[in-house]
């Protein structure tokens, strides 16, 4: 039985809200699978006008299964653009499709997807989603590229995405496919893999769309968005409205997720000796973490204070991550026990750091 932290310690809202992404996060699991499978994504259809309105299809094969993202980009009035759940129009709408879509599939979804919940769907649709542009960011990036220059780094750091999803629906919602009916989807049994794949593809679509619009404005001066900036940009998420009731209604599922995370942490803490390779990797990651948290921006005063405290704590904590100290007996256990003197944000960042080098465990 692993020596894991007590539920009374872990299952506190303050601590849960302080969790950081780790190698056990759903999106990270998906990316590892795609790398292992050497997945290639191709844009098989791009029917966009000069203003970026139209449709596109992205195809890929994962675990021997053909999948496609069908994307629609539509003009909407500024007054219609809202991230609230009561919205009835969005800049873009998407479906993750089971197989290779035909022209008739695309035409059918063209009349349904923009209506989202009000549309009618078949079991070939695995996931539905919609997204709005970050208008200020999207327009500034498009205009900069059309003038032959890269967008200002300050804006990229401040916002960090071109589009934000306002919903991602899967697993039987609104008449789409219920995955329990498909044994050939067993490789996607880890929670939210298809949803995360959809969001990953939407992110790629947003980059292609801004490049397309910029080039259409000024083909002679246009330069594509720098690859480093493309790698930095993510995808925004406007709401988390369904998260609270989902967690309340699925306690066993929540327990399983936490059990995996805490078990993995206990295996790392219980390592009597750390290999030199792992120690060097940890040292490298501590400096990457420092650069990462220094780039964080938020308008929330409470969270800003927490981040400021975390920044100061991390500068102090880095002194514990030397090769000499990490190669001592029970080094990780000593660091972890010592972290209890730091903020919850810092404690949970250390958890993610430890997990990062423990993939073989």
Predicted features, each with a name:
Residues 29-90:
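Amphipathic, interaction-prone secondary-structure segments
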Residues 1-49:
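Charged, amphipathic alpha-helical stretches
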Residues 1-13, 89-361:
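Mixed-charge, Lys/Arg-enriched low-complexity segments
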